[in-house]
Amino acid sequence: MNREHISNEAVLLDVRRLTCAEGRGKGVDLFRVTNLAGLDFDILIDRAMGIGQLRVDGKLISYTSETGIVHPAYYEKDGFGWLRSFGGGFLATCGLQQVGEPCQGHGLHGRIDNIPAQEISWRRWWDGNLLWAEVSGVMYEACHQGEYLSLRRKIRLNHKEKRIWIEDVAENHGSIPSPFMLLYHINMGAPFLIPGTKVLLPESNIQTFDSAAANHAECSHLVPDVSDERLDLLWLHHPKQTSKQQTAIVDNGIQKVQITWSSDTLPILGQWELLQPRGYVLALEPTNTHLQGQAWENASGTLRYLMPDETYLTSLEFAF
């Protein structure tokens, strides 16, 4: 499209701020982002700047759970209460002090996904023949006389490509070292996810989370149909080749999702599949943890700490 043929740049790349009006999602602010290439997705301002529903060329890619969008005021922090506000979406963020199994003082997947962003802004600019937009915000996970962590997020795209770039910088603003755990919960569901969907991953050493995952290893490469066994499977992939980036592809034969992440700071890839009637989802999860919870990581000597004033940079790229 010739730039001289349009009166408003929103025709090419649009960012609109909206607010949910009813139910448990009432009051949640979001940015709805669309581009000429066919991307259409929501950035959930009040849920750690995660990505909610995501469509490509009008077709839904992301998973939508039973709860839908839930305001963080309803967050239940203990045990598995996180699941009561997990609406799915394309990207949920887990951490910053806890990822995985609940343990003393820490519920499933930590607090960050239920923390609203602040210092919010967006901008749009031309760089040559490309119109770019960037949305940014910062989440603070803090406690008086406790942790004082932030996660500063930038989400970027242009008008011509079906690509999204995310850059996060975590920082410890406190005066003592802080446990630091981070996971990106990238969720795909129907109608994109269908039986026979291929999952192409880096060559890895595979660690099974339990006997069910060990007994269904083939499901990690080819997603089956729902099962009366009500399978809930989790694998951890440790890429054999060390590099600054790794790439995974999910291909249903018609559409593809390509995920590239900074494997120097996210060295493990979790893979979760829920294969139950009316519960059908695939999640790929770049992380710096083993998904066993903070207590397990501490006992195993693998718990990562952020020193005072230390920063931790991670990046993701999604291509469709």
Predicted regions and their residues:
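Surface-exposed acidic/polar loop and edge beta-strand patches at domain peripheries
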Residues: 1-165, 176-179, 188-225, 237-320
